[in-house]
Amino acid sequence: MSRRTERGPMAGRRGSRWPERRHGTPVLAPAVCRVQEVAPRESVAGDDRKEAAPRASCPARGLQLPAAPAALRLRSGCQDAAMAAAAVAAPEVLRECGCKGIRTCLICERQRGGDPPWQHSPQKTHRFIYYTDTGWAVGAEESDFEGWAFPFPGVTLIEDFVTREEEAEMVQLMDRDPWKLSQSGRRKQDYGPKVNFRKQKLKTASFRGLPSFSREVVRRMGLYPVLEDFRPVEQCNLDYCPERGSAIDPHLDDAWLWGERLVSLNLLSPTVLSMSREAPGSLLLCLAPSGFPEALVEGAVAPSRSVLCQEVEVAVPLPRRSLLVLTGAARHQWKHAIHRRHIEARRVSATFRELSADFGPGGRQQDLGRELLQISLSFQGRPT
């Protein structure tokens, strides 16, 4: 898995590669920071889009670190006209709630009164920031582990994967179909088979494939080595908005049906993916030396401190229009979540999932897997 941030077709050239240093800790500095450019395997045939103007950025563009080890917050920013037009939610979606069990949103919390359940759940005490260029998670500024780091493999980020125009068109097409109320203030659209994960059964009767507007997205994924053989059989669109208090709890995606790679396209606004692990044991840390981050990439510093896994949360900044790929430990061992505090404007995500080995060639369910792929890649789907 590459530790570098890959660049989408519309990427511009950037400035200095690394964040500024302050007392041994990387400080997010959008004006001087860049990510290493990794070109796709081949150019996009027939692509006549204009290249974006050069701009300075960093792996956590649009974010600021608090002085204390508190959660990352997003900077508010004005939205362009196209996005604003696409982002206006229908008024009626703010009057209903789809929460069940212990999960809540702002709508049902106001109706029920009292503190929301999540306020009483254990909070992670040590926060680290993931740096895409190194593949390491670094202790947040002025935290107990400021300047300490550990390797965090299995995350690939492709920035500017779609253009602003493509983003606006995709969201407009999504909004033409109905959104279903979901848990924790989200709305959703599913393109995939009906699945009972508990009984490990699925039905294909209502599945007509991925939506037509995803055909180009899936084709473009194949231009990158990490996704060159990626063939999704399911797409889940999720709609988040601050007015509903939208969020998603820490979770691991199923591994019976879904395969090695989870791929998610982040639209309309930046956010933060928060990753945590409940496993016992400790993480070994390295003290970032004066040569950070190159020394970390080379593995030149021996571990000299540890922290309990259960107390760690890793923040992975997701820029607007970026594509995230999770594999390996990041896919199977670290739970991922989107906290309510990291939704400051409407956000739409499109998550694509591939089949597990059981449904691939030589697997026990290879015939069913072949049928699912044929349906999926017809791109004639409507939300199920």
Protein language model regions, located:
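Serine residues within intrinsically disordered or low-complexity segments
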Residues: 2, 16, 43, 54-57, ...
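Non-heme Fe(II) oxygenase metal-center motifs and adjacent flexible, charged/small-residue loops
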Residues: 3, 58-384
